[in-house]
Amino acid sequence: IRILEFSQTTQDSFRSDVEELLSQGAESFIIDLRNNRGGSVDSSLGIANMFIPDGKTLMTTKFKEKSNNKDTVYTSTGYLAVDENVPVVLLVTGGTASASEILTGALRDNDRALVVGSQTFGKGIMQFTIAFMGGYLNITVAHYYTPSGADIHEIGITPDIVVNVDEEYSDEE
């Protein structure tokens, strides 16, 4: 299943795709996050919930405001659409960023996916965007960490199996 971005509707579309594939007898999943720049964190976490049992850590955030200097731990809520024994592979590249890295970290650190591809982008921050003087201003509001506590900002996630993909390859190849 290819996820091009995480929008407000991605989670529902993904759930429908998963349910359809399971009804057709799917025994494993490949989730393609190559060049997915991110988007809705809620959508990313919702998809992680489909694979990770109740109560497991999905990510931890540390907000930058002085009044809220506590870590916030996001845990799975128990909607397990895919059995824990079903193999999952995630495809990633240097263009895999932000919400895509949240999903990648959550599935890998909870032993739910094998990550294949090249080093991800390394956007370990959450930002709020506001319109400002005819343009936009991004304000960093939080830093996030994978379930294992890894800080991926400006580092990325190293795949379990590194496959260097030359930029000249298209999606069709």
Please annotate each region the language model reported.
Residues 39-98, 124-131, 145:
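Gly/Ser/Thr-rich loop/hinge elements
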Residues 2-6, 32-36, 61-64, 91-95, ...:
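Active-site-proximal beta-strand/loop segments in catalytic clefts of secreted hydrolases
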Residues 1-27, 49, 70-73, 77-78, ...:
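C-terminal, low-ordered peptide segments at domain boundaries
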Residues 12-24, 42-49, 86, 101, ...:
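Solvent-exposed, polar/charged alpha-helical surfaces in well-ordered, non-transmembrane soluble domains
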Residues 127-130, 137-170:
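Conserved P-loop NTPase
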Residues 3-14, 33, 37-44, 81, ...:
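Solvent-exposed, acidic/flexible segments
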Residues 24-29, 54-58, 85-87, 111-114:
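Loop/turn elements at helix/coil->beta-strand transitions in domains of secreted/extracellular proteins
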Residues 1, 31, 51, 88, ...:
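Terminal peptide-recognition signature
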